[in-house]
């Protein structure tokens, strides 16, 4: 088995952890800047509390991102053996420029999986070759409460943070 990509759980979740830290830094920093210095009472209510309200909203986004990331992490990782059906280099408009994403569509014979990869990992993937992916499936924030059992299961499996890719025989 050739290891194509490997990352620890911390490495797999690093992008989410950076966003969480950024949200909490902005939210708590805004609250401290707004309410620690003495404000003159002559300022209008809206002007006095607008930064505080914005900071609370940013903190709310930080908390929801934390909960969603925690749910995904505690759900555990999943390992599937799949065959690559298609490699795609997708270019989308991002604000004023264009962003390129590298994706592989795979199947295990029952379900389809779409994995987003870095360019160097994507370059190592071969169409019609078999790989073993270990990943953390995405788990939405309120999935346990809002989602009912469906009699028609989805053909696509939501994929999330990849921790390991190995090339295996078909």
Give the role of each language-model region.
Residues 136-170:
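OB-fold/S1-family single-stranded nucleic acid-binding modules
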Residues 25-56:
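Cytosolic-side transmembrane helix boundary signature
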Residues 118-134:
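Short nucleic-acid-contacting surface segments enriched for D/E, G, S/T with interspersed K/R
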Residues 1-37:
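Membrane-embedded alpha-helical segments of integral membrane proteins
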Residues 45-73:
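Internal/C-terminal transmembrane anchor helices
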Residues 42, 69-71, 76, 80, ...:
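Cysteine-centric segments in proteins
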Residues 93-114:
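OB-fold (S1/OB) nucleic-acid-binding surfaces
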Residues 74-98:
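Structural detector for short beta-strands of small beta-barrel domains
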């Amino acid at each position: 088995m050739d290891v194509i990509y490997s990352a620890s759980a911390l490495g797999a979740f690093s992008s989410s952890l950076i966003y969480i830290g950024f949200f909490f830094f902005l939210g708590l920093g805004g609250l401290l800047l707004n309410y620690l210095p003495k404000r003159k009472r002559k300022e209008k209510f809206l002007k006095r509390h607008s930064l505080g309200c914005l900071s609370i909203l940013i903190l709310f986004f930080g908390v929801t991102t934390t909960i969603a990331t925690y749910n995904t992490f505690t759900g555990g990782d999943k390992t599937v053996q799949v065959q690559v059906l298609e490699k795609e280099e997708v270019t989308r408009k991002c604000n004023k420029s264009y962003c390129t994403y590298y994706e592989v569509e795979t199947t295990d014979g029952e379900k389809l999986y779409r994995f987003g990869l870095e360019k160097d990992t994507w370059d190592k993937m071969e169409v019609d070759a078999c790989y073993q992916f270990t990943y953390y499936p995405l788990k939405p924030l309120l999935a346990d409460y809002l989602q009912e059992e469906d009699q028609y299961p989805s053909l696509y499996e939501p994929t999330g943070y990849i921790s390991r890719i190995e090339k295996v025989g078909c």
